[in-house]
Regions:
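SH3/SH3-like beta-barrel fold
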Residues: 207, 220-224, 232
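Catalytic domains of carbohydrate-active enzymes, especially glycoside hydrolases
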Residues: 277-300, 355-367
Length: 452
C-alpha cells in the first residue's frame, strides 16, 4: 500500500513538473487557419451578419495594407502593375499633408515651400510627367499611387503577390527608431493571438527575420518583412539585435518668424474706419504690449474677397510705440462663405492673395486668423488653407498667428499638433467658461479652467 502511495505521489510530481515546464504533451493546439482576407481587413459584414469580400467597381483586385504594427482598415487597389492606397489611410498613419480637392478632382501635397497638384487619372505632377498614374478615384474616394507617396515622403514598401488563399499584401514601413529584430529558431506557426488555441496566420520558416511589435512573457507580436503580423512563441525566437531605422523628414524646412521675446498681444476692436483714430488715446497708458491686432479684415463673398478697415497711419503709430501689427482676418460674415472658399483650391488662392496684398500694402508685421465657422466637415480644407497661407507668410517674412478654441473633446478635430507646425504662433482663446447662454452665472475664465 505504501509502495502504491509512493508511485501515485511520484506520478503526480512528474505530471506537475511537466505542466509547470509547459511541456507540449499537455498542450491543446488549434490546427485551423484564419481567413486571411477577414484577418487583414478585406471583408465587411453585410446586413445579414455575413462577411463579404470587398470588391472594386472597376474590377481591380483589392490589396491588404500592412502598416508598422497593424493592418489598415482601408484596403489598397491593384491596378495593372500599380498599387493605390486610400488617402485617409495615408493622412492618418504616414503624412497628413496630402489633400484631395473634390471641387476640381485633384490631389495635392504641400510642404513648407511648395504646393504640388496632381490631377486624377493622369501621370502628371505640377504639369511635369512621371511614369505612373499619380492617383485615382474609387467609391468617391481618392486613392494615391504608393509611388506618389514615396516621392514626397521617405517610406519603404514591399508588395507580396496573392497566392492561394492569401491576398496580395502591401507592406509599408515609415517610422524611425530602434527596432528589435528576432530570427525564428525553427519552422513555426504564427497565430492570431498569443495562445496555441488561436488560429494559424501563416507557417513561418526557420531563419525568418521578424520585427517585434509587442514583447510578451510567452508570446511576441511580430511582423515579417512581407507584411504578415501575428504572434510567435518567445521560445521559438532568437535575438538578432537592435536595428536603428531612420526615415528622413523635412521638419527643419518649416522655419518660423518669431519675436525675440515673449509676445504680449492686445486686440483692438475696430468697427469702422474712424475707430482707427482712437489709437493714441487707447494706448496712451498701455505698457508691456508689443503686438497689437486690429480687427480689420473680413471674408465677405464667395470669390475670396476681403472687406478692409485698414489704416496705414495706425500702423506707423504702432511701430513708433514699439508694437508690431498683426491684423486680424475673420470669417464672421457667413458660415456658407467659409465652406465655399476653403473647399476650393482656386478660391483659397484668391483669398490668400488678397490677404498678402493687404499685408504688403499696409506694411503689416503679420496676420491673425480668427475663424469660427470651422466644422469637422471642412477641417481638412482649413488645414490646407493654413498650409498654403504659411508658404506665403514664410516667404514674405510675415508672422502667421491663428486663434483656437480652448482645448476640449469637441474641438479635438482642430488638430493643433498639425497647426503648430505650420504657423508661427498658436493662440488659445481661453475664455467662454460661462457665457450669456450658460445656465448659471460664473467666471469667464477661472484659474482651474485656464489650467485645464
Amino acid at each position: 500500500m505504501r509502495k502504491n502511495v509512493r508511485y501515485i505521489a511520484l506520478t503526480a510530481l512528474v505530471i506537475s513538473a511537466f505542466v509547470l515546464s509547459g511541456c507540449d504533451m499537455f498542450r491543446k493546439t488549434n490546427d485551423g487557419k484564419v481567413d486571411l482576407k477577414w484577418y487583414m481587413g478585406l471583408t465587411y459584414e453585410d446586413d445579414n451578419g455575413k462577411d463579404v469580400n470587398y470588391t472594386t467597381k472597376s474590377g481591380d483586385s483589392v490589396v491588404a495594407v500592412a502598416l508598422e504594427d497593424k493592418y489598415s482598415e482601408q484596403y489598397g487597389i491593384m491596378k495593372d502593375a500599380d498599387v493605390f492606397v486610400s488617402i485617409d489611410m495615408v493622412k492618418d498613419n504616414i503624412d497628413p499633408r496630402f489633400y484631395y480637392d473634390k471641387s476640381n478632382g485633384s490631389l495635392m501635397f504641400t510642404n513648407a515651400t511648395t504646393s504640388y497638384e496632381m490631377p486624377l487619372n493622369e501621370n502628371v505632377i505640377d504639369k511635369g510627367k512621371v511614369n505612373y498614374t499619380t492617383c485615382i478615384k474609387e467609391n468617391k474616394k481618392c486613392y494615391i499611387n504608393i509611388e506618389t507617396v514615396k516621392k514626397f515622403v521617405d517610406i519603404n514598401y514591399k508588395l507580396t503577390k496573392a497566392e492561394g488563399d492569401a491576398p496580395a499584401i502591401l507592406s509599408i514601413t515609415y517610422k524611425s527608431g530602434k527596432k528589435n529584430i528576432m530570427t525564428t529558431d525553427s519552422n513555426i506557426e504564427m497565430r492570431t493571438k498569443g495562445d496555441y488555441q488561436n488560429l494559424i496566420v501563416k507557417e513561418i520558416s526557420k531563419g525568418t527575420k521578424v520585427t517585434v511589435i509587442e514583447s510578451g512573457k510567452n508570446w511576441d507580436k511580430v511582423r515579417t518583412e512581407n507584411g504578415y503580423i501575428g504572434y510567435i512563441p518567445v521560445s521559438e525566437l532568437n535575438d538578432s539585435g537592435t536595428q536603428e531605422v531612420s526615415f528622413k523628414n523635412d521638419d527643419d524646412t518649416y522655419t518660423h518668424v518669431t519675436l525675440d521675446t515673449k509676445v504680449s498681444l492686445a486686440w483692438n476692436q475696430i468697427y469702422n474706419q474712424n475707430a482707427n483714430n482712437n489709437f493714441d488715446e487707447l494706448t496712451a497708458n498701455v505698457k508691456g504690449v508689443n503686438v497689437i491686432s486690429p480687427t480689420w479684415f473680413s471674408l465677405v463673398d464667395k470669390n475670396g474677397n476681403l472687406s478692409s478697415l485698414a489704416d496705414l497711419n495706425y500702423v506707423e503709430k504702432a511701430h513708433k510705440k514699439g508694437m508690431q501689427v498683426w491684423a486680424l482676418v475673420n470669417d464672421f460674415t457667413d458660415r456658407k462663405l467659409t465652406k465655399k472658399v476653403l473647399t476650393s483650391t482656386a478660391l483659397r488662392k484668391k483669398f490668400i492673395n488678397n490677404i498678402m496684398y493687404f499685408a504688403d500694402s499696409y506694411e503689416l508685421d503679420g496676420v491673425n486668423i480668427d475663424f469660427e465657422y470651422i466644422t469637422e466637415e471642412i477641417i481638412d480644407d482649413y488645414l490646407q488653407f493654413l498650409r498654403e497661407l504659411s508658404i506665403e507668410c514664410r516667404a514674405a517674412k510675415k508672422v502667421l498667428s491663428v486663434d483656437n478654441y480652448a482645448p476640449s473633446k469637441w474641438s479635438a478635430y482642430y488638430d493643433r499638433k498639425q497647426q503648430i507646425k505650420l504657423v508661427d504662433y498658436l493662440i488659445i482663446m481661453n475664455y467662454d467658461e460661462h457665457t450669456s447662454a450658460s445656465d448659471e452665472a460664473g467666471s469667464v475664465s477661472s484659474m482651474s479652467y485656464a489650467q485645464n
